[in-house]
């Protein structure tokens, strides 16, 4: 049986040599769907659909902000350790701006923190 990480369907935008793939990071830390989709689009934007992917990321951040604000939620992202995010960003060749976006999305504590993510994308 082959390893799912060795198989890439539809391009190489997630294929990482020796590093952690996006789905591994999300699954390992039980990251929510909206945060996961956001980080997926930020990770791949330069190698797949460009600005369209950044707009998709923005859309997911907006939805997350709206849902959490409406709920007066104290729920937060599972707080992925910065070291893990750094390793992921390095393996996936993310630049400083992409690293900052992914880090903020994976460590937010209150809905107002998501506004900073949206400001960075504007």
Put a short name on every predicted segment.
Residues 1-122:
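Intrinsically disordered, low-complexity regulatory regions
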């Amino acid at each position: 049986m082959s390893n799912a990480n060795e198989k890439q369907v539809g391009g190489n935008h997630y294929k990482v040599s020796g590093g952690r793939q996006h789905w591994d990071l999300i699954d390992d830390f039980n990251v929510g769907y909206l945060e996961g989709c956001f980080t997926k689009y930020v990770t791949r934007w330069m190698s797949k659909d460009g600005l369209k992917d950044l707009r998709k990321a923005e859309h997911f951040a907006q939805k997350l902000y709206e849902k959490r604000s409406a709920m007066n939620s104290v729920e937060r992202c599972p707080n992925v350790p910065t070291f893990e995010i750094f390793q992921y960003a390095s393996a996936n060749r993310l630049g400083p701006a992409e690293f900052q976006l992914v880090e903020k999305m994976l460590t937010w504590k209150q809905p107002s923190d998501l506004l900073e993510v949206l400001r960075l994308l504007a």
